[in-house]
Amino acid sequence: MIDQEQVHKVANLARLELTPEEEEQFTTQLGSILDYIQQLDELDVSNVPPTTRAIDVSNITREDELQPYANRESILNSAPEQEGEFFKVPKILNSNE
């Protein structure tokens, strides 16, 4: 169980200024949270496989397919620089890297 002195110490470490009423309130709330965690700790999970998610997640991305765009020239013409059918952008990496 957590007491008001521990709440006061943690508040000081976190640079929080709590009133005595807030310290009492947080002591009660944190005590309830810790009691609940203790109940969870008592559960038998020996037959439960470790997981990072409660439900399975599958990859829902679509295939990367080429989709022609009718106004390609207008997009290329709006670029500051182009080289053939491509945008020309400034080099950002050194050749040493």
Curated annotation (Swiss-Prot):
It catalyses: L-glutamyl-tRNA(Gln) + L-glutamine + ATP + H2O = L-glutaminyl-tRNA(Gln) + L-glutamate + ADP + phosphate + H(+); L-aspartyl-tRNA(Asn) + L-glutamine + ATP + H2O = L-asparaginyl-tRNA(Asn) + L-glutamate + ADP + phosphate + 2 H(+). It holds the Pfam family GatC. Signal peptide: none annotated. The keyword Nucleotide-binding applies. GO terms for molecular function: asparaginyl-tRNA synthase (glutamine-hydrolyzing) activity; ATP binding; glutaminyl-tRNA synthase (glutamine-hydrolyzing) activity. Keywords: ATP-binding, Ligase, Nucleotide-binding, Protein biosynthesis. Its EC number is 6.3.5.-. Transmembrane segments: none annotated. One of its GO terms (biological process) is translation. Belongs to the GatC family. Heterotrimer of A, B and C subunits. This is Aspartyl/glutamyl-tRNA(Asn/Gln) amidotransferase subunit C. It comes from Nostoc punctiforme (strain ATCC 29133 / PCC 73102).
